Regions:
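Bacterial N-terminal signal peptides that target proteins for export
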Residues: 1-10
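N-terminal signal peptide
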Residues: 13-29
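Active-site mouth of glycoside hydrolases
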Residues: 32-236, 241-253, 368-371
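A mature extracytoplasmic/lumenal domain signature
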Residues: 51, 88-90, 153, 270, ...
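Glycoside hydrolase catalytic-domain groove-lining segments
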Residues: 214, 218, 222-319, 337, ...
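Short Gly/Pro-enriched loop/turn and capping motifs at secondary-structure junctions
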Residues: 315-319, 350-352, 487, 499-501
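Aromatic-rich peripheral "rim/lid" segments of glycoside hydrolase catalytic domains that contact
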Residues: 321-411, 429-430, 516-535
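Lectin-like carbohydrate-binding module/patch detector with strong preference for beta-trefoil
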Residues: 390-535
Length: 535
């Protein structure tokens, strides 16, 4: 670039820094403590995020033509998310002409006259702002709702992501110059230095394609991490894996080498379609077992190595008609509750300005509906909200470690109304303290245990539990069905009926039946150190 371009770039940088730092002066600083993300007091902060796209062709945060920016931020907060994984393209901060382009002109260049009118109506103060100022406005609006932001470098050239041949996949691809990428990371980290709710930087989304290799991953990801930390040492530095952010198996015997500590997080993506149609066509107990074993082998093992795992993308078709997605989600939620990892759902976006040549495309994975006015599927939102709750971690040792009995198909836990009433489901935050003894008894308050009753009967607590009818063990390939023998010797599994009562029934789907769905009988014992909340 010539000297004039360099001057414009420097002026742009200084102007944006000054405007950004007019917000709250003291930034929230997060760091890592073994596998946990913690605040300055050393208490766990669980990231319960939702992705918000700003990386497509228009380079305008999606949804601004549908609702006021403050309303979208309010929806995110009201749905229980404490964080947004905000997707951005490298060129937003490395191409001066793009960064200074106005929202109006960007939308106009794509022929999006209806979107222009929508932004004029819902966000008139943004329509003639630069693309970067619009991005800044989203961060600010989220901060006003106490929602944290992780800046996610999604692509280099603005576009929908992803394919092996889109030129955005790996270092050295046509749009993925490592030096330009590091320049972009550095600029973005500097631009948001001191902004109170910006807590982390995801260095790159879904590394992929024929050029991907381990040596270049180490070379450039370590350089990128060092650049971000140098520019803004308060940020968490979040590294993605290979194979569409699915594979960290190369870290089993080799460590990332950085000059700083306490900031490194690894991010993973996990969708049903990573395994084709296996969830729909296979035995769900077997598929869940195989998929979770594979995830442990290639990525989730990092938790045991003492690093936080941020599952920065997962999601399902919110219409509820995709059998593959529905079955996967129950297995995912069971794993997410058991491991209590940090996560980011794809996506808050209800519809796009312009995606892959289509104007106004609906996003069926979107938490919000097409006009961004409300949740697309409120029951699914409630179900996923169950894993927003942290079960344990630094600063959360409120009581002795115990178990909660989590039912992933509903996102609820087994609770008691009284010692004399049948067990039912309720919010996990209200669950009692369960203990699973070496003898496999599920006990509560010391003297009371869960007793197996005859098929179809309501379960309840008892003080007269024999070894045969109070020994509960995980069964099936998934290990997600809890089985015991009744006093008459019949094997039964816990199940939830249509009224959310806990009953016992004949164990389902133990054989190779592809059409069988065992989700009503799936339970998992989750470690917790939290006191029950009384409402």
């Amino acid at each position: 670039m010539g000297s004039c371009s360099l001057f414009v770039s420097a002026l742009f940088l200084v102007t944006i820094i000054v405007s950004l730092q007019t917000g709250p002066a003291r930034a929230l600083t997060l760091s890592t403590k073994s596998r946990w993300i913690v605040n300055e007091s050393g208490h766990r902060v669980k990231l319960a995020c939702v992705n918000w796209a700003s990386h497509l062709d228009a380079v305008v945060p999606e949804g601004l033509s549908k609702q006021p920016i403050e309303a979208i931020a309010g929806q995110i907060s009201s749905l229980g998310y404490n964080c947004v994984h905000l997707n951005w393209p490298t060129y937003l901060v490395t191409d001066d002409s793009l960064a200074s382009l106005t929202v109006r002109d960007s939308l106009k260049s794509l022929g999006l006259t209806e979107a222009i009118a929508g932004v004029e109506t819902n966000n008139p103060s943004i329509i003639d702002s630069s693309l970067f100022e619009a991005f800044q406005a989203v961060v600010s609006a989220l901060g006003d709702k106490n929602v944290m932001v992780i800046l996610d470098n999604h692509v280099s050239k603005p576009s929908w992501c992803c394919s092996d041949s889109d030129g955005n996949g790996f270092f050295g691809d046509i749009y993925f110059d490592p030096n330009v990428w590091i320049k972009g990371l550095t600029r973005m980290a500097i631009l948001f230095k001191g902004v109170s709710n910006v807590v982390g930087m995801s260095l790159r989304n879904e590394l992929r394609g024929p050029k991907q290799n381990v040596e270049d991953w180490f070379r450039y990801m370590q350089r990128g991490a060092e650049a971000v930390h140098w520019a803004n040492p308060n940020l968490l530095v979040i590294l993605s894996g290979l194979g569409y952010d699915h594979d960290f198996s190369f870290l089993q015997n080799r460590q990332v080498q950085l000059t700083f500590s306490g900031k490194l997080v690894f991010e993973v993506h996990w969708y049903a379609f990573f395994d084709g149609k296996a969830w729909e066509s296979g035995n769900v107990n077997q598929v869940c077992k195989i998929v979770v074993q594979n995830m442990n082998r290639i990525s989730l093992f990092l938790l045991e190595q003492g690093f936080p795992i941020f599952v920065s993308e997962f999601g399902v078709d919110q219409r509820g008609i995709n059998v593959n997605d529905n079955r996967y989600l129950n297995c995912f939620l069971a794993t997410a509750a058991q491991l209590d990892f940090d996560w980011g759902q794809w996506t808050v976006v209800g519809s796009y300005y312009y995606r892959e040549g289509v104007i106004g495309m609906s996003e069926y994975y979107g938490v919000l509906n097409d006009d961004w006015s409300e949740a697309r599927n409120s029951s699914l939102a409630q179900k996923i909200s169950s894993i927003q709750y942290p079960f344990q971690g630094p600063g959360l040792s409120e009581v002795r470690k115990h178990k909660v009995i989590f039912h992933p198909a509903t996102g609820l836990c087994v609770v008691k109304k009284s010692l004399l009433e049948p067990l039912t489901l309720g919010p996990c935050s209200t669950s009692d303290y369960w203990y699973h003894s070496p003898e496999k008894k599920l006990t509560i308050k010391g003297a009371f245990c869960l007793q197996a009753v005859e098929v179809g009967k309501l379960t309840q607590l008892s003080i007269k539990c024999t070894d045969s009818d109070s020994k509960w063990e995980p069964t099936s390939d998934s290990r997600l069905q809890l089985s015991a023998k009744t006093s008459s010797g019949d094997s039964v599994c816990l199940e939830v009926d249509s009224s959310n009562n806990v009953v016992t029934n004949t164990c389902k789907c133990l054989s190779i039946k592809h059409s069988c769905d065992p989700s009503s009988q799936w339970f998992i014992l989750v470690d917790s150190t939290r006191k029950p909340r009384l409402f």
